Amino acid sequence: MSCITTNNVKRLIILIIFVVIIWQFYYYASSKHNNNFLNEKIAIVPHDIKCLFNQPNCSEADVDGWSLVQAFIYFVVGLIIPNKYLIIIIVSIILEILKPFIGYEPKYIIGPLLNTTGYIVGSMLSPCKNNYKEKYQIFE
């Protein structure tokens, strides 16, 4: 039995839309007061790692609240649609490449690493994992 059903995909799309709407409302409201706690640095990444490609403003590419929110979204995706690692890595890299075009600062190394880590953890904890013991009868 596979857990990738039409209902799960619909729920995932609704969840992502809901999170993006809340994200935008919060960002708009907090930008007026300049106290957006999600912009606070949580972990400082070594300069050689975050500036691997020498992109502009790479020195600000540390782990912040927004990075963890994205990792949490990927965690939820991993719970609902597990074991699609290559697709998740490609999507994560493409989104980081597109960020400068929509006005966000990209984190070319840290973003995909955190997103993939969130997805892997969600995928490992997913109740939708294939049961290879029953499917292939190789373990007894």
Curated annotation (Swiss-Prot):
Bilayer topology: Multi-pass membrane protein
Transmembrane feature ranges: 12-32, 75-95
Domain of life: Viruses
Residues bearing glycans: N57, N115
Compartment list: Membrane
Annotated keywords: Glycoprotein, Membrane, Transmembrane, Transmembrane helix
Membrane among keywords: yes
CC annotations in GO: membrane
Name of the protein: Uncharacterized protein R495
Species name: Acanthamoeba polyphaga mimivirus
